[in-house]
Amino acid sequence: MNGRALSATLVTTVLLAVASSAHAGTALNAIKERGHIKCGVSDGLPGFSHTDEKGKFSGIDVDVCRAVAAAVFGDSTKVKFTPLTAKERLTALQSGEIDVLSRNTTWTSSRDSAQGLNFTGVTYYDGQGFLVNKKLGVKSAKELDGATVCVQAGTTTELNLSDYFRANKMKYTPITYDKSDESAKALEAGRCDVLTSDQSQLYAQRIKLAKPGDYVVLPEVISKEPLGPVVRHGDDDWFDIVKWT
């Protein structure tokens, strides 16, 4: 099957799913009546969700929601974006504040099975790493014994960090922040020795620093982070639409 035929088949599949779901899916009915999709995204992460000087959103996670809007309405602009911190994101979805969460969120068994959520697929496969100032003189994460570590609250990153230091018999002092920009600024200001996050976030945050060349991502990758969109559990019709889009 050539690319054009495959694309046509996928579009047809999605449109059929939308049509058949119109009678059953509560989320879809509410979205159609409202006239737009409510999409939760990150609060400023280049490559995933970021706004330009005119306030226009761009990035992988943004494109996912625009594609879903195109599938439902035939118009990719029928979407409103809500920037959320890591601590806010799951609650916003569970409470119905948003219809879909497309915010570099790790697919874990506990989130998928015990928190009333359904992950629709993987859009980016990541791994957790460490960003340090070169003047610290560190070449490996295994040299970070006794370090102060900036980490974003409400993330799997916190748990992975604890596991890694314990497994390597090292001590550390965590300093938590609600927003990724806050943790990066703390590293830049010298309030912590190292910043830990998904590697994609580390590279994105490094670009935004005043002197990005002064910082380096260490070679260790300490976790596997499959990132993808999330919807509420219990509405299979809406889940299928987001998944197949």
Task: For each feature predicted by the language model, list its residue ranges.
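Short beta-strand->loop
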Residues: 41, 57-59, 146-154, 177
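Acidic, polar ligand-binding/catalytic clefts
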Residues: 66, 70, 74, 78-143, ...
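Sec/Tat signal peptide C-region and signal peptidase I cleavage site
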Residues: 18-24
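Bacterial N-terminal signal peptides
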Residues: 9-18
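Extracytoplasmic small-molecule ligand-binding "clamshell" domains
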Residues: 24-102
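Bacterial N-terminal signal peptides that target proteins for export
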Residues: 1-10
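Ligand-binding cleft/hinge of the Venus flytrap
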Residues: 51-54, 66-77, 119, 157-176, ...
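Extended ligand-binding regions for polar small-molecule ligands
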Residues: 25, 63-72, 135-138, 142, ...
